[in-house]
């Protein structure tokens, strides 16, 4: 045995025990068995429980031994010796005693050894030796030790559940006595030894009210395993299981257990139908499971079958899967098949048919995102042509007139009747009966919604149906304004005469091919329209712009009146009074139309929509003046809509929908065709404008306690590199005064934060206030500062909420701000920065009531002493010192320290030494109650020094002086480095990623 171990254990020399940590591991690794054998008789002595000196010596020796085992990875080699020491601890009382409930010395030793052993829970041979003894500590009455053992045994059960199966009785006794953490072990043990766990399963049900959600889930997972093999074991638990149905966390798995029980013995669940109904109502996601249980349990008699059928029919229209349960019940009891059942089935089928109608005809949603909206037509339309593989995928909305809507999918037209190859209008097809899902007819001038959306299987498909009264000339359905588009796409079909295809959305990177779905009927429209796009050099754009030219298929007589002018609501956000001077236009689609995309971010070209009308008779042309509408698109391009104007709106024979824009009352009339500008604005910007006074008052108050970060970035932490990387937010603070002696004139104080949500919210509010004070307007999410915060929030994924929800939520409360203040305090920010009242007389003053500046900017009179680098003392006095390795076990030494602008020097009985300030990398502060510094740790390249005032005073002054000197030294030596003088408590080694 090593000489130092021999002296410490033989003489119980506590003064030398701390020196054991100076001995290299290699010198004592072979003596561990002998050391443990020497410790065993010491702790077996009757006087050990009362001898504090012996307890301290043994605890230090055990800690050193366990440290050596861990570092040298020799746990398997010395496991037997450690287990022998555990057996010795088992012979003594391990329960906390006295009013302070202090842990007995043997319990402390056992806890240290057990935690060290179970670090190797994946090693089977070690677990074979340790588990039998470790389990014996469960009934010893030490709750803390038992709770820790539950966690250790859960880890061991992952790979070695078979080793725990012989100890199931001890585990169950500990669970029943209140150690519910062991419930997580039972499922693993059951999989390898079901006979050991099954008899105890019913005993767990009364414990559920005292368990937390994870422990309850562990019990139900065990029950789900048991009910598949031995359902009879849980028959007595049915009432308690039904009582747990209202728990949303475990409702689904409880239903699965009850379903297996109903299959085993249907009569068990008959008396609990009402509880099942209530559970399904509370948790709608369990309706299918509930229906299966009631069907399986109720099929035994006609009365119970009727109850089950009533439940199934109640939810059948919204749960198509329940038709199978209705079929089972009606097959068992045909008398139950009544008109009510038939009506429900028909309603469900009608809903499905309507969804198919929407999916196949009315809302042809391709992989490019095409939505077809039907307006009043009776003629069939051709199927969509597939887009070539190389074509970009787009989001498209197709607006088609339709007179009636059928609940039955319309078959695609044959080539003989399809209007693709014909230049004449298509003959009207016989309309199918309209489904009851649409009831309201539009009135003249009605700007409200005139129809309801039929149910669809995908919520992203938008379908609007219009049934315009014969002869009406106005009232375009307002839901058309939801087609927020700034681009135009064409549908093939030279004589389709009126398909209006409006494109929206960004172009995905991957090409997408379209399927060949049928398209709903469309009516003929009139005058052809030329839609062209040019870049700034006048060259037609074929990629990134619109290049569409239409040819006339048939000239519409003027007696038929004007056609529909439909344009994008986003294009028409800003319009003038001249824009709507009785303009009437139409868009018709040629057969050879090409699909193109107009990017919304770079629109330098002008898109024009104008009539290429044939020559009109003189009498007709005299009554029509030409109007021009110029509308801005994204601020730097124009949309020009020109064409003949008219005040005549005669009755049309084909009863198709159209819109008349009358400019005589354009300022007084509500335009149902276009969304108001306010609706299209950024909701965050609207929120800030509406609540700016509250935001300004709040930030003026908060600025007194919290500094605003100037920037936020992201680091990728490697703390958990073996499992995954972790993204950490990093804050950058600047001095807001920037005086001549500023510590951070060229650098930023940076710190990592564990509360990015609150900081991002505070930064957002601060950005808004500062921008408003300067520019008299608030920022939108498109501005660079706000968009950067939004990107950081999306990358961090702190919570399952959007950036808009975060910044429009309630302002951070006092307790949230206190957490941020503590972060600043622990990072050392408050040691080098101070808050002061903003000087409003300064033209470059801070926008808020208070400003945060570094110490030297707030106290320029003290700058000379800190910055001259001389040896003149700034602070001096006696400090207690510890340094070197294993400082925890070393004694404090009192020495006299002097801090100047260049050195930290000390004097003592052993002589004097000095540390150059430039060598100090950082200072870490240890704080006590009320955040008062107790000690501080100085880190250099080759040593670590712990200091604290001898009398406990002046610690805060020492920390501040050290922080300022170090900050100035680092800024002087590395003026471009963006680093803080006092790094926050490390979250892990990290590398910048954003």
From Swiss-Prot:
Region ranges (Disordered): 404-461, 486-521, 536-565, 973-994
Keyword Cell membrane recorded: yes
An example Gene Ontology CC term for this record: plasma membrane
Low complexity composition bias: residue spans: 415-433, 540-553
Pfam families recorded: PH (PF00169)
Primary location recorded for the protein, binned into one broad class: membrane
Stretches with biased composition (Polar residues): 486-517
Keyword flag Lipid metabolism: yes
GO biological process, one term: positive regulation of insulin receptor signaling pathway
One Gene Ontology molecular-function label: molecular sequestering activity
SMART domains the record matches: PH
Compartments reported by the entry: Cell membrane
Topology of the protein relative to the lipid bilayer: Peripheral membrane protein
Record key words, sorted: Cell membrane, Developmental protein, Lipid metabolism, Membrane
Database matches in InterPro entries: ARM-type_fold, Melted-like, PH-like_dom_sf, PH_domain
Leader sequence segment: none
Domain PH as annotated: residue spans: 872-967
Role: Participates in fat metabolism regulation by recruiting FOXO and the TSC1-TSC2 complex to the cell membrane, which positively regulates TOR activity and negatively regulates the expression of FOXO target genes. Involved in R8 photoreceptor subtype specification. During early embryonic development, may be required for ectodermal patterning.
Domain writeup: The PH domain is required for membrane targeting.
Subunit note: Interacts with TSC1 and FOXO.
Family that this chain belongs to: Belongs to the MELT/VEPH family.
Protein name: Protein melted
């Amino acid at each position: 045995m090593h000489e130092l171990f021999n002296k410490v254990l033989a003489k119980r020399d506590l003064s030398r025990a701390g020196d054991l940590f100076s001995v290299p591991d290699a010198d004592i690794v072979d003596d561990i068995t002998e050391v443990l054998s020497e410790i065993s008789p010491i702790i077996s002595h009757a006087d050990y429980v009362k001898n504090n000196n012996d307890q301290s010596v043994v605890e230090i020796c055990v800690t050193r031994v366990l440290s050596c085992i861990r570092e040298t990875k020799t746990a398997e080699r010395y496991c037997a010796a450690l287990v022998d020491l555990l057996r010795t601890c088992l012979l003594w009382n391990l329960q906390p005693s006295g009013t302070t409930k202090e842990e007995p010395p043997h319990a402390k030793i056992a806890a240290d050894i057990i935690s060290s052993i179970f670090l190797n829970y994946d090693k089977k041979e070690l677990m074979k030796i340790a588990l039998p003894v470790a389990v014996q500590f469960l009934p010893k009455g030490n709750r803390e030790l038992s709770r820790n053992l539950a966690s250790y045994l859960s880890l061991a059960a992952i790979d070695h559940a078979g080793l725990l199966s012989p100890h199931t009785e001890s585990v169950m006794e500990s669970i029943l006595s209140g150690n519910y953490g062991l419930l997580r072990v039972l499922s693993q043990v059951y999989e390898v030894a079901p006979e050991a766990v099954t008899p105890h399963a019913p005993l767990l049900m009364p414990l559920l009210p005292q368990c937390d959600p994870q422990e309850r889930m562990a019990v139900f997972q065990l029950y789900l395993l048991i009910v598949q093999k031995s359902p009879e074991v849980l028959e007595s638990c049915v009432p308690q299981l039904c009582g747990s149905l209202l728990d949303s966390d475990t409702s689904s798995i409880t239903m699965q257990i009850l379903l297996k029980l109903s299959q085993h013995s249907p009569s068990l669940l008959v008396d609990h139908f009402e509880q099942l109904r209530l559970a399904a109502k509370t948790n709608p996601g369990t309706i299918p499971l509930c229906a299966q249980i009631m069907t399986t349990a109720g099929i035994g008699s006609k009365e119970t079958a009727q109850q089950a059928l009533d439940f199934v029919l109640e939810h059948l229209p919204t749960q198509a899967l329940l038709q199978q349960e209705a079929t089972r019940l009606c097959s068992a009891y045909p008398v139950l098949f009544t008109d009510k059942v038939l009506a429900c089935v028909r309603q469900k089928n009608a809903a499905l048919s309507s969804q198919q109608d929407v999916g196949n005809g009315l809302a042809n949603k391709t992989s490019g995102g095409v939505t077809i909206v039907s307006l009043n037509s009776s003629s069939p339309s051709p199927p969509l042509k597939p887009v070539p593989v190389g074509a970009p995928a787009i989001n498209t909305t197709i607006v088609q007139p339709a007179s009636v809507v059928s609940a039955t999918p319309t078959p695609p037209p044959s080539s003989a009747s399809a209007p693709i190859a014909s230049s004449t209008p298509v003959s009207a097809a016989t309309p199918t009966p309209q489904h009851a899902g649409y009831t309201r007819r539009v009135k003249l001038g009605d700007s409200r919604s005139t129809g309801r959306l039929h149910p669809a299987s995908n919520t992203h498909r938008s379908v609007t149906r219009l049934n315009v009264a014969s002869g009406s000339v106005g009232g375009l359905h307002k839901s058309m304004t939801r087609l927020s588009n700034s681009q135009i796409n064409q549908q093939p079909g030279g004589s389709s005469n009126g398909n209006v295809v409006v494109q929206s959305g960004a172009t995905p990177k991957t090409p997408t091919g379209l399927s060949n779905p049928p398209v709903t009927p469309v009516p003929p429209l009139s005058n052809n329209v030329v839609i062209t796009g040019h870049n700034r050099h006048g060259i037609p754009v074929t990629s990134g712009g619109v290049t569409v030219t239409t040819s006339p298929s048939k000239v519409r007589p003027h007696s038929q009146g004007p056609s529909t002018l439909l344009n994008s609501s986003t294009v028409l956000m800003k319009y003038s009074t001249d824009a709507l001077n009785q303009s009437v236009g139409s868009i018709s689609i040629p057969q050879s139309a090409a699909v193109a995309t107009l990017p919304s971010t770079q629109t330098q070209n002008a898109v024009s929509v104008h009539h290429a009308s044939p020559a009109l008779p003189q009498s007709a042309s005299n009554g029509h003046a030409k109007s021009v509408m110029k509308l801005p698109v994204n601020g730097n391009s124009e949309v020009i809509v020109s064409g003949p104007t008219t005040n005549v709106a005669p009755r049309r024979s084909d009863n198709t929908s159209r819109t008349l824009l009358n400019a005589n009352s354009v300022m007084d009339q509500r335009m149902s065709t276009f969304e108001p500008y306010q609706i299209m604005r950024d909701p965050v910007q609207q929120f800030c404008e509406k609540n700016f006074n509250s935001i300004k008052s709040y930030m003026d108050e908060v600025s007194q306690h919290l500094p605003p970060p100037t920037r936020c970035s992201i680091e990728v932490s490697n703390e958990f590199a073996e499992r995954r990387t972790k993204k950490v937010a990093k804050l950058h603070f600047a001095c807001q005064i920037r005086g001549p002696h500023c510590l951070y004139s060229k650098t930023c104080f940076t710190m990592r934060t564990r509360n990015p949500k609150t900081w991002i919210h505070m930064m957002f509010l601060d950005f808004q206030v500062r921008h408003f004070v300067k520019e008299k307007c608030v920022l939108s999410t498109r501005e660079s500062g706000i968009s950067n915060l939004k990107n950081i929030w999306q990358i961090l994924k702190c919570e399952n909420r959007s950036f808009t929800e975060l910044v429009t939520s309630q302002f951070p409360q006092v307790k949230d701000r206190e957490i941020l203040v503590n972060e600043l305090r622990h990072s050392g920010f408050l040691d080098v920065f101070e808050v002061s009242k903003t000087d409003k007389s300064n033209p470059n003053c801070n926008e808020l009531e208070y400003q945060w500046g570094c110490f030297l900017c707030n106290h320029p009179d003290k700058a000379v002493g800190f910055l001259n680098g001389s040896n003149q003392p700034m602070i001096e006095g006696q400090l207690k010192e510890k340094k070197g390795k294993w400082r925890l076990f070393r004694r404090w030494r009192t020495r006299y320290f002097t801090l100047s602008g260049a050195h930290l020097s000390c004097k003592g009985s052993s002589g004097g030494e000095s540390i150059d300030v430039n060598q100090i990398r950082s200072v870490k502060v240890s704080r006590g109650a009320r955040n008062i510094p107790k000690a501080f740790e100085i880190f250099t390249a080759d040593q670590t020094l712990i200091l604290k005032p001898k009398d406990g005073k002046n610690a805060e002054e020492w920390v501040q002086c050290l922080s300022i000197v170090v900050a100035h030294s680092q800024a002087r030596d590395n003026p471009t480095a963006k680093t803080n003088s006092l790094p926050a408590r490390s979250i892990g080694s990290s590398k910048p990623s954003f």
